[in-house]
Amino acid sequence: MRVGKLCRLALRFWMGLILVLGFSSHYYNPTRRRLVYSRILQTYDWLLMVINLGAFYLYYRYAMTYFLEGMFRRQGFVNQVSTCNVFQQLLMAVTGTWLHFLFERHVCQTYNELSRILKHDLKLKEHSRFYCLAFLAKVYNFFHNFNFALSAIMHWGLRPFNVWDLLANLYFVYNSLARDAILVAYVLLLLNLSEALRLNGQQEHDTYSDLMKQLRRRERLLRIGRRVHRMFAWLVAIALIYLVFFNTATIYLGYTMFIQKHDALGLRGRGLKMLLTVVSFLVILWDVVLLQVICEKLLAEENKICDCPEDVASSRTTYRQWEMSALRRAITRSSPENNVLGMFRMDMRCAFALISCSLSYGIIIIQIGYIPG
């Protein structure tokens, strides 16, 4: 399966990249077929984190003078939006560091556990097409963070691109990759959970012991799923808030470039700047929708009930066990643990609510920005 091979290559490349960038102290061991802890990687990891947090002050000083005076009609308002964006990046960096310190080992252990269930218990041969396409889409969005062409050409025609511009953009790219690396790990765990639940539901069982084994495995997977949601809950919440704000600022920036087409900002490369702004906006919206689709797929697999084996359907003990499993599933489905921060009992309306929120705030911020001072 060509898409499956491409998915495996993307996974290996992503795992290698996060090691180079210092986002993980675990590496994949092909011999043991699991993630393995390394003290050397942990030292390298924490060194880069300290440097990253220490460099924030220089980035903040640069960001305060990023937009030149007279570049926008409402320069003061633009500077306020820019300042909020910078401090939200700091919040994301601190949250990511905190979660990295608390949960990295648990996340890697969970990944190893799911991989073991898929390979040994469920005899996985090839991932489903949905798994491959969803993961490739997420990895594409992750690599899109390398693109800082818009900020690089923002001053085109006003001043030359210098070393500080390059360093500041690399810092922004690094923090964007750090944020999305954790989100990719979250999506990867959700996809593995969905695959495990799907394959477990397809297992054939002709005896009572087979049914019991299937039900116990299912309950184990559901417990893993609740644990994953709890570990990533705050990061996902903060990341979604940041992305809505960033898209709002992107709308404002695009509108400004459009409305000031005869001003200094529009003298050079206006069409290219507008195109890059639209691409940035759409990629973020697609990333949010992708998360919703994956969560919806996982919930669909969780809500399926294992079939009772036909040849022992008359067995009172077997039928009662199946009935109790269905009852436990109904209780768990409405449990607060499945509703962490209100984000994990999702349907597609939630995705479009986020999109609508981003567009609405974009319109409001444009109106505020152009109120005569």
Curated annotation (Swiss-Prot):
Subcellular location: Cell membrane
One GO cellular component term: plasma membrane
Cytoplasmic side: 1-8, 104-132, 192-230, 295-350
Topology of the protein relative to the lipid bilayer: Multi-pass membrane protein
GO biological process: chemosensory behavior; male courtship behavior; monoatomic ion transmembrane transport; sensory perception of taste; signal transduction
Principal place of residence: membrane
InterPro entries listed in its UniProt record: 7TM_chemorcpt
Extracellular side: 30-82, 154-170, 252-273, 372-373
One Pfam family here: 7tm_7
Transmembrane segments: 9-29, 83-103, 133-153, 171-191, 231-251, 274-294, 351-371
One of the record's GO molecular function terms: ligand-gated monoatomic ion channel activity
Keywords linked to the UniProt accession: Cell membrane, Membrane, Receptor, Transducer, Transmembrane, Transmembrane helix
Record family assignment: Belongs to the insect chemoreceptor superfamily. Gustatory receptor (GR) family. Gr10a subfamily.
Reported function: Probable gustatory receptor which mediates acceptance or avoidance behavior, depending on its substrates.
Name of this chain's protein: Putative gustatory receptor 10b
Species for this entry: Drosophila melanogaster (Fruit fly)
GN (gene name): Gr10b
